[in-house]
């Protein structure tokens, strides 16, 4: 079966690199499924799970936003943060998830947005960690 090369990169360095059969991500415009030979594309990503299918198995990577660049033979995900399901510290993610209090008080709009994004990232990480 044909494959496409995938690189997931963060400011801290590469997180994942391999040849896969299909890449699925959630872009700001909606879900995208990328197969080998896909047309060129650049899209902003949501905080979500990237799904990488290879050999009948699916690997999950928690992606905290960023951008997707697609070429016919390569997909690059440039993310602010990304973690493979097996690398996620579930206790740390649960601690972040329990930080819902700033969302309830809404004292400062900037703090609210930061807390909201931190909560989304934590929930995404927990969701991906459960997919191991």
UniProtKB/Swiss-Prot annotation:
NCBIfam families attached to this UniProt entry: ATP_synt_epsi, PRK00571.1-3, PRK13446.1
Cellular-component GO terms for this entry: plasma membrane; proton-transporting ATP synthase complex
Gene3D superfamilies referenced in this protein's UniProt entry, alphabetically: ATP synthase delta/epsilon subunit, C-terminal domain, F0F1 ATP synthase delta/epsilon subunit, N-terminal
UniProt keyword terms in alphabetical order: ATP synthesis, Cell membrane, CF(1), Hydrogen ion transport, Ion transport, Membrane, Transport
Chief location of this protein within or outside the cell: membrane
UniProt subcellular location: Cell membrane
Subunit description: F-type ATPases have 2 components, CF(1) - the catalytic core - and CF(0) - the membrane proton channel. CF(1) has five subunits: alpha(3), beta(3), gamma(1), delta(1), epsilon(1). CF(0) has three main subunits: a, b and c.
InterPro entries, alphabetized: ATP_F1_dsu/esu_C_sf, ATP_synth_F1_dsu/esu, ATP_synth_F1_dsu/esu_N, ATP_synth_F1_esu_C, ATPsynth_dsu/esu_N
GO molecular function: ATP binding; proton-transporting ATP synthase activity, rotational mechanism
Entry protein name: ATP synthase epsilon chain
Summary of the function given for this chain in its UniProt record: Produces ATP from ADP in the presence of a proton gradient across the membrane.
Signal peptide annotation: none
Family the UniProt entry places it in: Belongs to the ATPase epsilon chain family.
